[in-house]
Amino acid sequence: MEKDKDKQICWGIIGAGSVCRVKSAPAMNKIPGSRIAAVMRRTGEKAREFAALHNIPRWYDDADALLSDPDVNAVYIATPPGSHRELTLKAAAAGKSVYVEKPMARNWQECRDMISACKEAGVPLFVAYYRRMLPNYRKIKELVDAGVIGTVRSVHIRMNKPVNPDFDRDPGNWRVQPELAGGGYFYDLASHQLDFLDYLLGPATDACGIASNQADLYPAEDIVTGSFRFESGVQGTGNWCFTAAKSDEDDLITLTGSKGVLRWPTFAGYYVDLKTDAKPDAIRFHFDMPEHIQQPLIETIVRELQDWMVHDRSDIPLKYKAPDSMEASAADDATGEMAGSADAAGPADSAGSADSADSAGSADSTGFAGSAGSADSGDEVRRCPSTGITAARTNRVMEALTGKNPM
């Protein structure tokens, strides 16, 4: 019984807005071995209301007070990106495991600071790129890994969104305030797309682009056009226009292979279209989403943290793929994902499963946040695929695509 208590993940939530209320917090209380121990909001009354709604025993209106709570052993940072670095550094210094909302920070340097702090403190760092664990994205990975569309050649992202003048001009809309978000809607939305492509195709080695503000509704960029190349050799292009006509609203990713093509939306539906030379008539897979969309990812984080705690917070040998673009002192993410399959059935020729390793590679680190270790052949592969290192790569690519920091 005492051992089970030692494995309990007791969350402290900092920031409890709409994302937290719907996508993540309820899941934390539903997952075995996980519970919310405390919540913090700047307005005490709102914190108290949130605590009452989710049966949370303690609430705070000060982040430092929550971080000092001895019952909290993991912190979920659900504030705008502008405060992610500061709060992550404080959480790491307090010895708390960290799960931070996406995008990870406003820029790549802040991401690196967060990784370094967690490495020095010896605590895990995870980022809320939850799409990696959803059934539609697991099906995409399964199909690609099984070679159903052959060798992947290229990828194109197209996103057109019309303006919403009242909301876009709202001072409370932090997503278009660079000092709070790092950029505009591109940073908020494209980060999901670029993160998944990193997971699917490996790290990007080159990226460049141009960005501008066409509608002058807010300070951040509202159109981005760019190109990128992955370590695997796949080339990609993207166009993100947040000033488009309503009649041309679009959201589609096209992944072209030597034997077929996959197409799917990021936000406009939960389906995947497949066409191959062998089966030219399109096959559409439909998927049901979990009630709380972050739950599959949070489940993997809880299980991984429990493993870490059972090993007395020592290094667990894990495989990972080291990108050339990151400093040698930083450990990388693991290459595996949690076992499971998509809800929709695959075509007859889609052999394989979504829990296979992404890519081969040498390993000399655990990949939590960078502590030393080893990874021999046959060692357990990480359950959680979304770490500080993978998320930092996404920030790096976004900076290059917007022309802020060329790669």
Predicted features, each with a name:
Residues 1-8, 34, 74-77, 306-346, ...:
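C-terminal helix-rich "cap/oligomerization" subdomain common to oxidoreductases
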Residues 54-117:
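Beta-loop-alpha module in the N-terminal Rossmann-like domain of NAD(P)-dependent dehydrogenases
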